[in-house]
């Protein structure tokens, strides 16, 4: 499945599973669909009191019911429900704004300065792009060019 088709699928999935997730009291943080021999639909949820294994099981049951009816994915896949974890994925401008000052790993769709992988500190967000301090230099990244972003946990 190409990137554009994948993007459309993720938008469709978000539309049909947001209500069941929020109905159980959780925030839908993001969705990843990884297509391979063993395709995976990964749904990240969060809650102010944390996410437990039982939370994930409850959400999995509700989401499975909706997916069985809507049937938006045409290939076999495994459903995973997960908390964002220490290396929390960032999906929206709001997520980046929430973690200003934190270290982030970025994977870009299209290279900038012949580079697709970047790491730095999130400095600001304007809705369309983010500014990340990379080696004491500010770099601007369009949100639309970010394929994947994760916080870098500190230990």
Curated annotation (Swiss-Prot):
Q: Name one GO biological process term.
A: translation
**Database matches in Pfam families:** DUF150_C (PF17384), RimP_N (PF02576)
The record's subcellular location field reads: Cytoplasm
SUPFAM superfamilies per record: YhbC-like, C-terminal domain, YhbC-like, N-terminal domain
Give a Gene Ontology cellular component term annotated to this protein: cytosol
Q: Which InterPro entries match?
A: Ribosome_maturation_RimP, RimP_C, RimP_C_sf, RimP_N, RimP_N_sf
Q: What is its main location?
A: cytoplasm
Keywords recorded for this protein, A-Z:
Cytoplasm, Ribosome biogenesis
Does Cytoplasm appear among the keywords?
A: yes
Q: Which PANTHER family match?
A: RIBOSOME MATURATION FACTOR RIMP
Of which family is this protein a member? Belongs to the RimP family.
Q: What does this protein do?
A: Required for maturation of 30S ribosomal subunits.
Q: Can you say what this protein is called?
A: Ribosome maturation factor RimP
Q: Which organism is it from?
A: Hamiltonella defensa subsp. Acyrthosiphon pisum (strain 5AT)
- Gene name tied to this protein: rimP
């Amino acid at each position: 499945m190409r990137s554009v088709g994948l993007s459309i699928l993720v938008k469709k999935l978000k539309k049909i599973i947001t209500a069941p997730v929020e109905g159980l009291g959780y925030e839908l943080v993001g969705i990843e669909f990884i297509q391979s021999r063993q395709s995976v639909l990964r749904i990240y949820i969060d809650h102010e009191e944390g996410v437990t294994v039982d939370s994930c099981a409850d959400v999995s049951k509700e989401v499975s019911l909706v997916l069985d009816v809507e049937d938006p994915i045409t290939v076999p896949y495994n459903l995973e429900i997960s908390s964002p974890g220490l290396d929390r994925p960032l999906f929206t401008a709001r997520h980046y704004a929430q973690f200003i000052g934190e270290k982030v790993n970025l994977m870009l769709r299209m290279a900038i300065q012949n580079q697709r992988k970047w790491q730095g500190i999130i400095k600001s967000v304007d809705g369309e792009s983010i500014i990340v301090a990379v080696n004491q230099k500010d770099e601007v990244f369009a949100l639309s060019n970010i394929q994947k972003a994760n916080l870098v946990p500190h230990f």
